[in-house]
Every structure is written in C-alpha cells, then in structure tokens.
Amino acid sequence: MANAPHGGVLKDLLARDAPRQAELAAEAESLPAVTLTERQLCDLELIMNGGFSPLEGFMNQADYDRVCEDNRLADGNVFSMPITLDASQEVIDEKKLQAASRITLRDFRDDRNLAILTIDDIYRPDKTKEAKLVFGGDPEHPAIVYLNNTVKEFYIGGKIEAVNKLNHYDYVALRYTPAELRVHFDKLGWSRVVAFQTRNPMHRAHRELTVRAARSRQANVLIHPVVGLTKPGDIDHFTRVRAYQALLPRYPNGMAVLGLLGLAMRMGGPREAIWHAIIRKNHGATHFIVGRDHAGPGSNSKGEDFYGPYDAQHAVEKYKDELGIEVVEFQMVTYLPDTDEYRPVDQVPAGVKTLNISGTELRRRLRSAHIPEWFSYPEVVKILRESNPPRATQGFTIFLTGYMNSGKDAIARALQVTLNQQGGRSVSLLLGDTVRHELSSELGFTREDRHTNIQRIAFVATELTRAGAAVIAAPIAPYEESRKFARDAVSQAGSFFLVHVATPLEHCEQSDKRGIYAAARRGEIKGFTGVDDPYETPEKADLVVDFSKQSVRSIVHEIILVLESQGFLERQ
C-alpha cells in the first residue's frame, strides 16, 4: 500500500471539483483573468493534482511568512518552499483585485482557463528576507536572481478550484498524477517504493545507486525526473526522457518504473530537498534518495558553493519523523576497474584504483571521444550524442558591441564573407540599422526601447542558433543588462561570443563622414550613445578589439581563431 499523503489527505482538486466542472468553466469565462507564467503553470498543476498536498492554493501571507521563517505552514505542517502567485500593481489595478475577489487562472500557451482562485489576501513580500531565509542570500543564486529580476512586487494568496487539466503533448503516458501513480503501485503490488529525483541524464553509477538503495530496503524504484523548469544550461527534457527510457531495461526485471514530474525547481538545496521529499511522499513513495549537493545550483562566480555537500541530507534528517518518508542518504558511487564494480566512495579501501568522468569531460567526449561502457550504456550514449552534435555542426552567435561608427558593421560584413567561404553552415547578419528598420521601426531611443530592441535581436539570434546557423549581430547595445539578456537567451540554444569593438569615442567621431556625432553635439539628436547617453563597458567580453589600431582583416582573423579554438570550424 502506498505511503499516506503529506497532511493525511491527498488534495486532488481535479477529482474533487470534477462534478462541478461545467459550472466552474462557465463562471471562469465571466471572471477577470490572470495569465500564468511557465513557472506558475508548473506550480498550479502540482497544486491541482495533489503533488503539493496539503496545499489547496497559492500561499496567503500567514502561510508564506511561516514557511520562510520556520519551514512550516500556518497550521503547523512541515513545508519548506514558498508557493506563491506574483502579480504587478498594474495587473492588480487593471483587474480590480482585492480580498474575496474571484479570478480565472489562464494558460499562456493556449489561452485555456485552468482554475478559479478566491483571493484571501494580496500582500507585498519581503524579498530580502525570502532570499536570505529560503535560499541563503547569495545574490548570484539563480532563485534569488529570479526573485529580484522577474518576480512581481505583490503576491496573491488564495484557494483554488480546478477547471481544466493542463494540456501536455509530450510523454503523456509517463506524466502520472499522484493518484494515478498510487493506483499503479497498487496494481503492481508494490508496498515499498524508493523515489529517485534527477534533472540530468542517468548513467551506470545512477543505476547502481538506485538498485543498491532498493535492495537494501527490499523495495522497488520510482525514477522520477523533473521535466518542468530546471537549471539554465541543463540538457533538454526530451533528450533526457529518451535516455531514461533506454536505461530502464537495464534494471532487474520489474524493479523500476519511470514517471515524469512537471516541477519548476528553485535549486534551493536543503529547503528543496525537504520539498522534494514531500512531493514524492504525495506520489506514494515510502523512501527518497537524497544525494550529495541535492538540488544545489553549484557555485557562484567566486567558485564558492552555495550549499555544503551534505546540507540537504541534514535538513531532511531534521524533519524525518514529521515528513513520514524514509530518507536514503547516499554518497557518490565510483567505479573500481580491478573488480569491475561500483561502490559508494566511503566504502572504497585506501589505495584501491577508482575511475570517474566529470560532467565537463563527459560533454567533451560526447562531441568526439570514446565513452567507456563502465561509465554509461551504449544506448544512452547514442541518444545523448544525437542531441549533442559536434561543435562543427552547432550554431553560434557573434555579438559585436561598441559605439556607432566603431567599425562593427565593416567587421560584421567581412566576417560574414569569411564564414560563407568556410562553408558548413548558413550565416545570418543582423546589423543595427537593418534591425531598427525591419524589426524595431516603432521603437525610440529610451533605455527601455533600446533594451526591447536587443531583446528582439536576441530572440532572432537564439532561434537561428538553435537551427545551426552562424549569427553575426552588430548593434550598439550600450547597456550591460541588455547584453547579459542576449547572452543568457542565446546560450540556451548554442554558444554566444561577445566581441567588444572598443574603438575610442574620439576616433568614432573624427571618422564620422555622415556628421551624426556633430548633430548630436549640437543637440539636434537626443539620447545619443557617447554624447548624452552612456555606453557601459562590457564586464565579460570574450574578445576586445580596436578598429583605430587594427585592420578589419586582423580583427576578423582574431574572431576566426576564437571560433577555431572552440572547435566550431573543424571539417567533418
């Protein structure tokens, strides 16, 4: 029999509200609607299907404050992660939202009405406190970056009534709700289930770890990977799920089941581990594996880890009696070539030879080198290689930034010709003036409009890069915020190289044959970069060149050398 849900009752709002679906759907059409973001959709789905039991909605201020301060809901139940619905003052005013208002929650992907929320309260969170207490306070932590840069200024708390399930079109048969997974376990006769959380591909070490955990508890295995929002730069879930499916037959017959979890991770380390344990308990698991640096985001720019390697294990251990799910603490396992076996690192005798492959080394080997079978299975490697083609066939973006008349356009055109001569991929050119004319003709030159212009360039560059093209963009891009946005966006699809064309302003003015700088100096043009609007020097350029001291040919050659050093120009 599956484990009891957290709080004693599975809050399956979809099943609870199904008899009233027609009535609720009709009402939802008449209410003010709030369109949810991708993260809010992930949260709503797990609220409605009971994955976040005992929650029945987005947290009001009483629940939010106590979760931040004490890892508990207002009623005393352990819960470690704030589940909140953020909204701007503009939306609150436009929709006339207040306590007791009923609003429709809508899916941004297809405009379907998913739920009705009855507002308990609207409150301004203390983001500084949330960042410190929940995530540790490091401003580089991805959840804190999201909190400070994306989350709106108010939270809306209230209970949910379910109208429609979210639509999914990928791996539908593997997207078990908690109730469905519990029924599945009962059909199989499973009474002890060890859940394994992952956001990465699984290799032999993971198989060995989970089999050891199951055998030590005389249990079965639930492979429960996250397919919602994970860490930027992670391998896409389509590739990962194919790899999990390929791995499944390597388990002893009947030992393991694969189910997908549409969770939006926060990478919250200790807090996240407690949250993950609650979610797996709600899905019927009796045991949960918490490994080294569970749900941690790695390290900051100084190389400092956000969390200690076993902080997550200690956090879950603290609440184990109240959580009602047994934590299986596992250290890393490593390969012993002399005996052809895996063992936990703390069980390896001193002096015994071990082998391992780091994530960085694996990425290198996926492109061109051999991956031994002791590390991963051939069928898994094949799938990963299909989604990680050699650098020579991948897309990339060269982003040139600098003052007007710094030489960006001449460099970009010459680079385009050079790359076309090399062959192997299509080459797209996004010059500043061309983009302004074709994509951003209605925009002015305020800071907001300039940022919007770069966002549009980044969108186009991202999609072209994803399709395997070489993209050369050459806007002025005077603001660090905009350049960082472009790097982050394109890096989801391929490689991004920022080239600072650091030609001095004096040279740009002196060689300006069109007289644009002179007109700006006379006050005829307002908001002109370098005259009455600043150019923020790039903090992390991949290459710095100077058109006043170098020729176009030498600059293009430097860029080509950067690409060649990264393997983008190797012949196949």
Swiss-Prot record:
The record marks F330 as: Induces change in substrate recognition on ATP binding. NCBIfam families: apsK, PRK05537.1, sopT. ATP binds at Q197, T198, R199, N200, G291, R292, D293, H294, V333. Its EC number is 2.7.7.4. The keyword Hydrolase does not apply. Residues 394-572 are annotated as: Allosteric regulation domain. Catalyzes the first intracellular reaction of sulfate assimilation, forming adenosine-5'-phosphosulfate (APS) from inorganic sulfate and ATP. Plays an important role in sulfate activation as a component of the biosynthesis pathway of sulfur-containing amino acids. The active site is at T198, R199, N200. InterPro entries: APS_kinase, ATP-Sase_PUA-like_dom, P-loop_NTPase, PUA-like_sf, Rossmann-like_a/b/a_fold, Sulf_adenylyltr_euk, Sulf_AdTrans/APS_kinase, Sulfurylase_cat_dom. One of its GO terms (biological process) is sulfate assimilation, phosphoadenylyl sulfate reduction by phosphoadenylyl-sulfate reductase (thioredoxin). Homohexamer. Dimer of trimers. Residues 1-169 are annotated as: N-terminal. This is Sulfate adenylyltransferase. Residues 170-393 are annotated as: Catalytic. The keyword Oxidoreductase does not apply. Sulfate binds at Q197, R199, A295. The record marks H203, H206 as: Transition state stabilizer. 3'-phosphoadenylyl sulfate binds at D433, T434, V435, R436, R450, I476, A477, R514. It holds the Pfam family ATP-sulfurylase.
